Every structure is written in C-alpha cells, then in structure tokens.
C-alpha cells in the first residue's frame, strides 16, 4: 500500500494501516492519505492474505474526509480501529486540528455505517473522548474491543506538553456499555519507562 499521486485524497503518505477482516483470506486495510493541502483522509485498499504483496483495489474516493470548519477533525482524519457491531460497522478514528499554544489537538472520533448504507456518517461532530478532569490534554487513537461484559477502549492519553511541539502521552483504558459513551478514570494500560515521552 502506498500513496497514489493520481488519486486526489492520497497523493502523499500511507498512514496507520488498520485491518478489517471480510471473510476468507480477504482483508480491507483502512489507511490515511494526504491531499494537496496536506490534510489526511481515510480510504482503503483490498488485499488477499494469500498474496499480501498485491493490492487488489484501492478506494477512488475517501470514506471519511475532514470535518466542518471549527470541529475537532477539520484538518484531518486517520483510522485507528474498525469493528462490526450488530448490523453496522464502526470506524473509530483520530481527528486533527491545528493548535494555538501547542502544535495540534488530537481527539478520538467515531463514524458509523449501517449494513447496506452507501457511506459512513459521523456519530457526532464532537469527539467521543474529549478533554475531561482526568484527561485534560490530547485523547486519541481509540482502539476498541467488544467483550462479553461491555466495551473496552485503549487510547492515547496526554499527560502534559513538554513544549509546543512535543506531547507526552501513555496508553489508558476507558469502558462503555454501548461503545458510544465512555467512562474514564485515568486507568493506565501501558506506562512510561524511564526516559520515555510517548507510547
């Protein structure tokens, strides 16, 4: 999988490949490409695990584009997790927005596509993991697991900005009853080793 100068949404970059099993040996790889304005969009490529070095198809247009001006993802989106739930597919993603005193803001979003629908729609124009008392900095890259007793999210949680270009973050855990509304208590899944800034 690589950028495609002939496709407007992915002229440069091929970021955060995120797999979705389709059945048999077919896998859809969701990934982020950048347009001429350096804004990331989410599209996909199709591969067969029996010939993983051959790309069978790549989306001609993105499945998810940056959000409306002023929203948390107005300057770019990247995939972080795709999960099937009942009769719908959920695309959990990273939203980018230029910062002010810091280089950027990063928060986690969700888009949903019901079976048979033509396109994903945002669950909300707001992040599903926004700033809160226990997470006052960046909260992004949600990776979601559905368990017999509920939903669990592993996500990137900022703990400080070392300077305007360098956030410091670890991996924390959130819980949910429906995969939509999340409870966070600052529970750390993977913490820093001495000298580390980012996980």
Pin down the residues of each PLM region.
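Short, solvent-exposed interaction modules
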Residues: 79
């Amino acid at each position: 999988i690589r950028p495609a100068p002939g496709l407007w949404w992915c002229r440069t970059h091929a970021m955060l490949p995120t797999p979705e099993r389709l059945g048999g040996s077919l896998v859809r790889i969701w990934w982020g490409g950048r347009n001429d304005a350096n804004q990331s969009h989410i599209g996909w490529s199709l591969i067969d695990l029996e010939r993983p070095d051959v790309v069978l198809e790549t989306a001609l247009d993105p499945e998810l584009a940056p959000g409306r001006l002023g929203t948390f993802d107005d300057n770019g989106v990247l995939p972080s997790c795709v999960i099937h739930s009942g009769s719908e597919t959920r695309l959990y993603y990273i939203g980018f927005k230029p910062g002010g005193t810091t280089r950027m803001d990063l928060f986690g979003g969700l888009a949903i596509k019901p079976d048979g629908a033509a396109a994903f729609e945002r669950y909300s124009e707001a992040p599903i993991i926004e700033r809160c008392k226990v997470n006052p900095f960046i909260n992004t890259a949600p990776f979601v697991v559905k368990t017999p007793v509920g939903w669990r999210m592993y996500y990137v949680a900022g703990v400080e900005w070392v300077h305007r270009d360098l956030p410091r973050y670890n991996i924390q855990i959130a819980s949910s009853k429906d995969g939509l509304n999340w409870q966070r208590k600052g529970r750390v899944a993977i913490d820093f080793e001495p000298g580390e800034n980012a996980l």
